Amino acid sequence: MKEKLSNYLLAAVLQAMLAVCRGTKMEFKGITKREEGRFITRYDVEYETVDGKQKIYEMISRSDDITDYDKLHGKVADAVVIIATDEADERIVLNKEFRMAVGDWVYNFPAGLIDPGEEPQQSACRELLEETGLELYRVDDMIGTSYSAVGFSNETNVCIVGKARGEFKESTSTFEEITPGWYTKAEVRELLKKYKFAARTQAFCYVWSRK
């Protein structure tokens, strides 16, 4: 019995020493493209855990050319998110949008992909105009870079914070169903109680509506 216990303890110590030698994080081993679509590509990412086990993680990306670790996590932002209020910071722009991936209406911030050659601020102005008809006439801040769905994708966003004005117009694309609106803090608090939000929009609106 003592001999078995000693062997068990020895094995545990050796395993712990091995983990220390490897470091405290998983080791990237490689990435394999599994399926390429028009807008997203699915990959299997292989890691080795600290105890030497293989971990295959399924993920999707906007990029169709991820071949190494640097391309997995070192890329430029894919999209912009626009956080726009009126001049007095009393109302915020939210889109009520039908999201096809979930088959439901969701409240979120205006957002969209950054076109090749565009700066994030340019993309923000274009996307806000296309989705709502409003003009982003002032940019106060640019927050980057964040992951939009870190559980299964390396898609990244830059948040553009600024002021908007103008009249609402229908989206310029029939592939999107969007109803934009101005909302006061009291109205946002009521929306949060009753309706579904994109996670980042929900978190920001909760804090903003209570300032």
Model-assigned labels for residue ranges:
Residues 39-81, 88:
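Acidic, metal-coordinating catalytic segment for phosphate/diphosphate chemistry
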Residues 76-83, 88-126:
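Conserved Nudix-box catalytic region and its N-terminal flanking loop in Nudix hydrolases
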Residues 33-36, 71-74, 150:
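Short Gly/Pro-enriched turn/cap motifs at secondary-structure boundaries
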Residues 24-36:
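Short amphipathic beta-strand and strand-loop transition segments with alternating hydrophobic
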Residues 50-51, 86-89, 98, 163-167, ...:
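Short loop segments at secondary-structure junctions
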Residues 78-81, 112-200:
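Unchanged
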Residues 1-25:
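N-terminal amphipathic/basic-hydrophobic helices that include classical n-h-c signal peptides
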Residues 67-71, 103-108, 181:
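A short, polar/proline- and glycine-enriched secondary-structure boundary/capping micro-motif
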